[in-house]
Amino acid sequence: MKRTYQPKKRKHAKTHGFRSRMATKNGRKVLKLRRLKGRYQLTVSDK
């Protein structure tokens, strides 16, 4: 049986990347909260 998680770097970045977070109001809220919390990595594209 094929496993359900087949990682793709491009899809990961397109869905959870910085630009996609900035594109929506809720995404910007996510970044704001992660900045407030002091996260070292805001999004997956900060690797």
Curated annotation (Swiss-Prot):
This protein's source sits in the domain of life called Bacteria
Cleavable signal peptide: none
Q: Where is this region: Disordered?
A: 1-26
The keyword Cell membrane is annotated on this UniProt entry: no
Q: What is the lineage of its organism?
A: Bacteria, Bacillati, Mycoplasmatota, Mycoplasmoidales, Metamycoplasmataceae
Q: Say if the entry is tagged with keyword Nucleus.
A: no
Under the heading InterPro entries, the entry gives:
Ribosomal_bL34, Ribosomal_bL34_CS
Q: Which family does it belong to?
A: Belongs to the bacterial ribosomal protein bL34 family.
Which is one GO molecular function term here?
Answer: structural constituent of ribosome
Q: Alphabetically list the UniProt keywords.
A: Ribonucleoprotein, Ribosomal protein
Q: What is this protein called?
A: Large ribosomal subunit protein bL34
Q: Name one GO cellular component term.
A: ribonucleoprotein complex
Q: Which PANTHER family match?
A: LARGE RIBOSOMAL SUBUNIT PROTEIN BL34M, MITOCHONDRIAL RIBOSOMAL PROTEIN 34 FAMILY MEMBER
Which gene is the coding source of this polypeptide chain?
rpmH
Q: Which GO terms describe its biological process?
A: translation
Q: In what ranges is there compositional bias, type Basic residues?
A: 1-19
